[in-house]
């Protein structure tokens, strides 16, 4: 009995001791991770800079003397400048790459042929530099990019009135050495060009019973302000009522829109032509005209017109067009002038208030939706 009694305490003690030893061995192991977690939880990452990634990239690129950096150089600049990018967190590198490739304010320059490595240089688009003037690198509010796009200069032409951007092919020349560069077309506030060109066009078509009232000019507008040559002789201005074309019926003031016919001659029409034009036709389509060959066309010597578009003359005459057989439908012109483009300006909105006159009847209307250049037919 004594042997088992003697054996039990060591067994129990051994078991208890083993349990105690096991408990003492597990306690430090269990306490170790807990202390480590507490230590990591107490350490905070540095605060993120109060700038957007676009601004951070711009800072890095502008710090370079050459105003261009590779992706790795941008990384190095950010890590040296801000402690936030020095830790174990590497997700900011993806953000830098995405902002470089997705924003149009950054341009990837082509790599030189002799430069080793795979990195491309990145620079700032010159058109976007105004966004970062005076060091404005703070975070932008939502919608800032759209506002910046709206603030960019707008060079689009409104109603076709951009005279400074007309190509040289639109430089137009008269028959008497009159030449106008596109930049010399002066827009002085009115439509006085109608007074001279209309009067010069209908000066030779004299009928006592027809007259056209003097069209008002706001501020003496003239298209020949910057031109050199004998403009006064070929484009006279009349202050009184002038004889009108028989194509415009008597008493019909009408609406004449400013795509007028340029006349380079004020000579009288032949009597036969003026007599044949007394009746007129319902619709006479005028093509873009130019100085023609006098030998091929008897009317070209006295009436040399340069129409801006294809106007339609609406008539109220009831006579047939048989008397117009002697007048060619299309005035031919030399091949060198046929290739010239037409002068097309949209002054409808500007001329609506100053060009309307009282009276009814016929009107002078032009088609602005299309234009075609007919081939030269001699």
From Swiss-Prot:
> What CDD domains does the entry give?
FH_FOXF1
The UniProt entry's GO biological process terms, in alphabetical order, are: animal organ morphogenesis; cardiac left ventricle morphogenesis; cell-cell adhesion; cellular response to cytokine stimulus; detection of wounding; determination of left/right symmetry; ductus arteriosus closure; embryonic digestive tract development
GO CC, sorted alphabetically, is: nucleoplasm; nucleus
Q: Which residue ranges hold the DNA-binding region?
A: 47-138
Keyword Oxidoreductase belongs to the record: no
Establish whether keyword Transcription regulation is in the entry: yes
What InterPro entries does the entry give?
A: Fork_head_dom, Forkhead_box_regulator, TF_fork_head_CS_1, TF_fork_head_CS_2, WH-like_DNA-bd_sf, WH_DNA-bd_sf
Pfam family, any one: Forkhead
Region annotated Disordered, chain positions: 1-45
Q: Where is the composition biased (Low complexity)?
A: 24-42
> What does its UniProt record remark on the domains?
Activation domains C-terminal of (and distinct from) the forkhead domains are necessary for transcriptional activation.
Q: What is this protein called?
A: Forkhead box protein F1
Q: What organism does the record attribute this protein to?
A: Mus musculus (Mouse)
- Which classification does the entry list for the species? Eukaryota, Metazoa, Chordata, Craniata, Vertebrata
């Amino acid at each position: 009995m004594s042997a088992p009694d003697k054996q039990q305490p060591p067994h129990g003690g051994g078991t208890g001791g083993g349990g105690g030893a096991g408990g003492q061995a597990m306690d430090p192991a269990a306490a170790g991770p807990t202390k480590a977690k507490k230590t990591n939880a107490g350490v905070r990452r540095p605060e993120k800079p109060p700038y957007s990634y676009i601004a951070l990239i711009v800072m890095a690129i502008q710090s370079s003397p050459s105003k261009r950096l590779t992706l790795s150089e941008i990384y190095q600049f950010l890590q040296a400048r801000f402690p936030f990018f020095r830790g174990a967190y590497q997700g900011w590198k993806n953000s830098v790459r995405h902002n470089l490739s997705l924003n149009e304010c950054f341009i990837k320059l082509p790599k030189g042929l002799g430069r080793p490595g795979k990195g491309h240089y990145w620079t700032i688009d010159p058109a976007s530099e105004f966004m970062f003037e005076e060091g404005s690198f703070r975070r932008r509010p939502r919608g800032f990019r759209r506002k910046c796009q709206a603030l960019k200069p707008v060079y689009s032409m409104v109603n076709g009135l951009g005279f400074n951007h007309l190509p040289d092919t639109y430089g137009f020349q008269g028959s008497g050495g009159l030449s106008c560069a596109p930049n010399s077309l002066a827009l002085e506030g009115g439509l006085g060009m109608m007074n001279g060109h209309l009067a010069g066009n209908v000066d030779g078509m004299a009928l006592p019973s027809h007259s056209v009232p003097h069209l008002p000019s706001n501020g003496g507008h003239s298209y020949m302000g910057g031109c050199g040559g004998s403009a006064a002789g070929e484009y006279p201005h009349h202050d009184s009522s002038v004889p009108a074309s028989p194509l415009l019926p008597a008493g019909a003031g009408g609406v004449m829109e400013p795509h007028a016919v340029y006349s380079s001659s004020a000579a009288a029409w032949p009597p036969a032509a003026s007599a044949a034009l007394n009746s007129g036709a319902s619709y006479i389509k005028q093509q873009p005209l130019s100085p023609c060959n006098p030998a091929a066309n008897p009317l070209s010597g006295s009436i040399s017109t340069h129409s801006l578009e294809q106007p339609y003359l609406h008539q109220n005459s009831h006579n047939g067009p048989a008397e117009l057989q002697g007048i060619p439908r299309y005035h031919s012109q030399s091949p060198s002038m046929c290739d010239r483009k037409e002068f097309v300006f949209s002054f409808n909105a500007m001329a609506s208030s100053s060009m309307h006159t009282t009276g009814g009847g016929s009107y002078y209307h032009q088609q602005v939706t299309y234009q075609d250049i007919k081939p030269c037919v001699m």
